[in-house]
């Protein structure tokens, strides 16, 4: 499947997360992104070094600025189960705006065309690192990394595009 790109409508599919009442929710992407400006940023794995020390902290640190520029939701996405994503989210006590969601089976990652084969590293099929800006489901920015790089998908890169 070809990777998602600018101008595409983000595919519908399901993601899972724990809500503020600690209840597991499985929802369609369209239900949380329709009519909104949403940043969906993907990482290869929870608790991995670049994701934990650079990518996620960047979005947490810039969340207020992103929201001031009209962003309604900031969603961190990974091919992990929702329990792992919940635990990972708790490692950022300063976080007030980034929602940690799971694509447990990797099906949504496949719909996006953003799979990354990390079997040689013992991680299986994961998500490429990326940052998408969605405006009422339409992709207006698609910053997708090659391999395990972290050069175009930061919060700063999204801010520059706003």
Curated annotation (Swiss-Prot):
| Superkingdom of origin organism | Eukaryota
Select a single GO molecular function from the record's annotations and give it.
Answer: thioredoxin peroxidase activity
Q: Where in the cell is it found?
A: Cytoplasm
Among its keywords, does the record have Transport?
no
Q: Does the keyword Oxidoreductase apply?
A: yes
Per the record, its GO cellular-component terms are:
cytoplasm
**What does the record list as GO biological process?**
cellular response to oxidative stress
Where does the entry say this protein is expressed, by tissue?
Answer: Highly expressed in buds and flowers. Slightly expressed in green tissues. Also detected in pollen.
**Which family, according to UniProt?**
Belongs to the peroxiredoxin family. Prx5 subfamily.
Miscellaneous comment: The active site is a conserved redox-active cysteine residue, the peroxidatic cysteine (C(P)), which makes the nucleophilic attack on the peroxide substrate. The peroxide oxidizes the C(P)-SH to cysteine sulfenic acid (C(P)-SOH), which then reacts with another cysteine residue, the resolving cysteine (C(R)), to form a disulfide bridge. The disulfide is subsequently reduced by an appropriate electron donor to complete the catalytic cycle. In this 1-Cys peroxiredoxin, no C(R) is present and C(P) instead forms a disulfide with a cysteine from another protein or with a small thiol molecule.
User: What PANTHER family does the record point to?
Assistant: PEROXIREDOXIN (PTHR10430), PEROXIREDOXIN-2A-RELATED (PTHR10430:SF8)
Function of the molecule: Thiol-specific peroxidase that catalyzes the reduction of hydrogen peroxide and organic hydroperoxides to water and alcohols, respectively. Plays a role in cell protection against oxidative stress by detoxifying peroxides and as sensor of hydrogen peroxide-mediated signaling events.
What protein is this chain from?
Peroxiredoxin-2C
According to its UniProt entry, this protein's organism is Arabidopsis thaliana
Q: What is the lineage of its organism?
A: Eukaryota, Viridiplantae, Streptophyta, Embryophyta, Tracheophyta
């Amino acid at each position: 499947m070809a990777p998602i790109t600018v101008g595409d409508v983000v595919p519908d599919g399901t993601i899972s997360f724990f809500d503020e009442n600690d209840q597991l929710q499985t929802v369609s992407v369209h239900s949380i992104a329709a009519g909104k400006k949403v940043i969906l940023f993907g990482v290869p794995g929870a608790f991995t070094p670049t994701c934990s020390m650079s990518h996620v902290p960047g979005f947490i640190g810039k969340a207020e600025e992103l929201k001031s520029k009209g962003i309604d939701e900031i969603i961190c996405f990974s091919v992990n189960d929702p329990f792992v994503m919940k635990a990972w989210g708790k490692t950022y006590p300063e976080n007030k705006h980034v929602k940690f969601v799971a694509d447990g089976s990797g099906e949504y990652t496949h719909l996006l065309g953003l799979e990354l084969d990390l079997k040689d590293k013992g991680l299986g099929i994961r998500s490429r690192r990326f940052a998408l800006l969605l405006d009422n489901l339409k992709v207006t920015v698609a910053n997708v990394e090659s391999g395990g790089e972290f050069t175009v998908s930061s919060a700063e890169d999204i801010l520059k595009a706003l």
